[in-house]
UniProtKB/Swiss-Prot annotation:
Keywords: Cytoplasm, Methyltransferase, rRNA processing, S-adenosyl-L-methionine, Transferase. It comes from Parasynechococcus marenigrum (strain WH8102). GO terms for cellular component: cytoplasm. SUPFAM superfamilies: alpha/beta knot (SSF75217). It is an enzyme of class 2 (transferase). The gene is rlmH. This is Ribosomal RNA large subunit methyltransferase H. HAMAP family: 23SrRNA_methyltr_H (MF_00658). Specifically methylates the pseudouridine at position 1915 (m3Psi1915) in 23S rRNA. It comes from the Bacteria. S-adenosyl-L-methionine binds at L63, G92, L111, S112, P113, M114, T115, F116. PANTHER family: METHYLTRANSFERASE (PTHR33603), RIBOSOMAL RNA LARGE SUBUNIT METHYLTRANSFERASE H (PTHR33603:SF1). It is found in: Cytoplasm.
Length: 144
């Protein structure tokens, strides 16, 4: 997994400083990872902004409650199988993603069957990206 080939498109700003601190901690460990903030709006307007931000050659991974629930090791393996493809992880706002965006995704992924604030989902995703990289590199960070 190459962080410089990954982008996170997330609706909304991170308002809690402790979440922002966590995001920055892992972002420093994943050089090249890009985070695009999409302005909060109606689901249709958010979808328009997300579509406009997606690149034609990106493998779109939509985060949603009803997506595939996978453990950290299968997640790392899946990212490894994607090789050098450019990845766009999409995190919706309070109302989630539109059906059109869900359908456009190459993979629908769930971090948990529970619902989390989008800013916390962003932190959880970036930690899992770092963990996936550690798993693939054989780093002791992942001890499960």
């Amino acid at each position: 997994m190459n962080p410089s080939r990954c982008r996170i498109l997330a609706v909304g700003k991170v308002r809690r400083s402790w979440i922002q601190d966590g995001i920055e901690l892992y972002r420093k460990r994943l050089p090249g990872l890009e985070i695009i903030e999409i302005r909060d709006s109606t689901p249709d307007k958010e979808a328009d902004s997300i579509r406009a931000s997606l690149r034609p050659n990106e493998h779109v991974i939509a985060l949603m409650e009803e997506g595939d629930a996978v453990g950290s090791i299968p997640f790392a393996r899946r990212l490894d199988q994607l090789g050098n493809q450019r990845l766009a992880f999409v995190i919706g706002g309070a109302d989630g993603l539109t059906n059109e965006l869900k359908g456009r995704a190459h993979w629908q992924l769930s971090l948990s069957p529970m619902t989390f604030p989008h800013e916390l989902a962003r932190l959880m995703l970036i930690e899992q990206l770092f963990r996936a990289q550690a798993i693939l590199q054989g780093s002791p960070y992942h001890r499960a």
